[in-house]
């Protein structure tokens, strides 16, 4: 596991060399790009790449383009395009006027393919997909193509007819002529164009041939003036092909490709295919389910842009794959919310507390601080009366050793911001369930401090005024998967699902100040955790809160 502290970014070291006097890009503006495929929602894994691309541009006062990689006609959707834009803006990044689609370059891709054919560096091949595998060879045997020496004019004619739609899918491909004996199979005359009679979400039916990613991507980078094409580690073996393309067609720029390890997180899956299966089979409520690792899911759960950026930056940039504990992501959120979230009182599993010596019908306002870490956030007034709600866990009819909360004839306890109380007994129903707790209060202890300065031996507990509060539904989330590595080879990831990843509590009580709560606000429910109003379901008169993260955890960075 990577050490979760700020680490040296080897990408920046490469860039420093490139822009230094005599370097490849000396005197040039550092220019990166983020090229998501619009066939799904961005997740926390994409977020690392996004922050590397945009963050690198920020560091060097450079530019970062947003380019939708929509060269594959079968997967793209406008819904995903808009969602990706929203997520990037939410994280605090902007691409200015540099928003592009890969499909915008189809005509240029075609022209460069023709250029390669004319140079004798590409040819039309008739091998079927099955034959292609058969002729591919192995480490000791070169690949073979009986069409490699097809005359240039014949390849030009066939390629033009491929574009005109004369042939069915897979009848022909266009292959780069590189090295059939290369130890890197990506260089064994790779396919750079294929026939696909598919409707494209932006180009319509204009095209029936589509460039392969390994051909289109370096051309797009070069045409946009990208200096550093930053991508994940699986493209390391594709770098020779990337370089070959930009060196053999007449593009105006020659970008440098640099690879970094993808972000892996335990207790989750980041495969779009598997995430889609969770959605389509009803294991989660949608792409924005707060248990999902998608940015829209994390946002709905209450994650902040700062916490996610901080997480990605502290994980660092690695050259080899690593898996980061999900608990570290939670740590970063907890760290942020501890500083910024307003403290409020909420009771999730309520039981009534009656202060028997407090006047019936009386109500008063007590002062509670909004955030002890931020005095500038001030205080608020909270109503207090004879009848309160407290947590069931804050009372035991028969106490256990070292229990310091309420029990009959136990020690004084402090009601947060209000008074000291002493439990005198309880009321039970016919099933021997406690339905009401009885206590007396010290009228001279307003604010929680006794007038005589005596030591309070009991705990401080939170409460909600039963005469002035709101009902709420609270959703508490846990890891979506019990298994820390549900994505491992040979595992059925669905069999690893945590059946207790969602607990819905109804009949919760929250203080009246939350009556109009709405996303994206975040709150610390005192002693319980950090919560946020659900962005879809929370509304005045129907309050719904999601637990963003627990109040404490044993996880510490670097462990």
Regions found by a protein language model. Give the residues of each.
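N-terminal catalytic cores of NTP/NDP-binding nucleotidyl/phosphoryl-transfer enzymes
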Residues: 7-15, 20-85, 199-232
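Secondary-structure transition/capping motifs at alpha-helix termini
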Residues: 21-26, 55-63, 89-96, 222, ...
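Intrinsically disordered or highly flexible coil/loop and linker segments, enriched in small
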Residues: 24, 93, 122, 168, ...
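Conserved short loop/turn motifs at secondary-structure junctions
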Residues: 36-38, 67-75, 97-107, 130, ...
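Active-site cores that bind ATP or allylic diphosphates and position pyrophosphate for catalysis
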Residues: 66, 70-72, 115-275, 329, ...
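A glycine-rich helix N-cap at a beta->alpha junction
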Residues: 80-107, 112-113, 120-123
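Long, charged, mostly alpha-helical binding arms that flank functional sites
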Residues: 253-332, 336
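Substrate/cofactor-recognition hotspot
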Residues: 311-319, 326-559
């Amino acid at each position: 596991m990577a050490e979760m502290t700020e680490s040296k970014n080897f990408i920046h070291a490469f860039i420093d060399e490139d822009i230094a006097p005599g370097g490849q890009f000396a005197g040039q503006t550092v220019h990166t790009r983020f090229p998501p495929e619009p066939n799904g929602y961005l997740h926390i894994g994409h977020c690392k790449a996004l922050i590397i691309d945009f963050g690198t541009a920020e560091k060097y006062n450079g530019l970062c383009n947003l380019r939708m990689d929509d060269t594959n006609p079968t997967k793209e959707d406008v819904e995903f395009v808009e969602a990706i834009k929203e997520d990037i803006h939410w994280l605090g990044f902007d691409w200015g006027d540099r928003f592009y689609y890969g499909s915008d370059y189809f005509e240029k891709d075609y022209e460069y393919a023709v250029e390669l054919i004319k140079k004798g560096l590409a040819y039309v091949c008739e091998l079927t997909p099955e034959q292609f595998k058969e002729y591919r060879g192995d480490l000791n045997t070169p690949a073979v193509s009986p069409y490699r020496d097809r005359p240039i004019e014949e390849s030009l004619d066939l390629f033009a007819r491929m574009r005109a739609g004369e042939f069915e899918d897979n009848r022909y491909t266009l292959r780069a002529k590189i090295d059939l004996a290369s130890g890197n199979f990506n260089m064994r005359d790779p396919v750079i164009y294929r026939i696909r009679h598919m409707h494209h979400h932006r180009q319509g039916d204009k095209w029936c041939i589509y460039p392969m990613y390994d051909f289109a991507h370096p051309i797009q980078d070069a045409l946009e003036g990208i200096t550093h094409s930053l991508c994940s580690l699986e493209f390391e073996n594709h770098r020779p092909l990337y370089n070959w393309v930009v060196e053999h067609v007449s593009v105006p720029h020659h970008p440098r490709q640099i690879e970094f390890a993808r972000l892996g997180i335990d207790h989750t899956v980041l495969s779009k295919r598997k995430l889609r299966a969770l959605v389509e089979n009803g294991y989660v409520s949608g792409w924005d389910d707060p248990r999902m690792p998608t940015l829209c899911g994390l946002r709905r759960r209450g994650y902040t842009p700062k916490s996610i950026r901080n997480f990605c930056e502290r994980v660092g940039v690695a050259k080899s794959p690593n898996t980061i504990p999900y608990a570290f992501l939670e740590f970063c959120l907890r760290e942020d919310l501890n500083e910024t979230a307003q403290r409020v009182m909420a009771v999730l599993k309520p039981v009534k507390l009656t202060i028997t010596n407090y006047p019936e019908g009386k109500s008063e306002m007590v002062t509670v601080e909004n955030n002890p870490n931020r005095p500038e956030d001030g205080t608020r007034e909270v109503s207090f009366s004879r009848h309160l709600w407290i947590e069931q866990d804050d009372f035991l009819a028969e106490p256990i050793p070292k229990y310091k909360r309420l029990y009959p004839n136990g020690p004084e306890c402090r009601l947060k911001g209000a008074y000291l109380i002493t439990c005198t007994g309880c009321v039970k129903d016919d099933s021997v369930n406690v339905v009401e707790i009885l206590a007396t209060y010290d009228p001279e202890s307003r604010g929680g401090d006794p007038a005589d300065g005596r030591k309070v031996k009991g705990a401080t507990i939170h409460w909600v005024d039963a005469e002035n509060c709101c009902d709420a539904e609270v959703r508490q989330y846990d890891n979506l998967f019990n298994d820390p590595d549900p994505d491992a080879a040979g595992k059925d990831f669905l069999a690893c699902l945590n059946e207790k990843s969602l607990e819905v509590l109804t009949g919760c009580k929250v203080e009246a100040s939350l009556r109009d709560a709405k996303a994206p606000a975040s709150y610390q429910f005192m002693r319980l955790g950090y919560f946020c109003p659900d962005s879809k379901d929370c509304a005045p008169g129907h309050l719904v809160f999601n637990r963003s993260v627990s109040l404490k955890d044993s996880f510490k960075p670097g462990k």
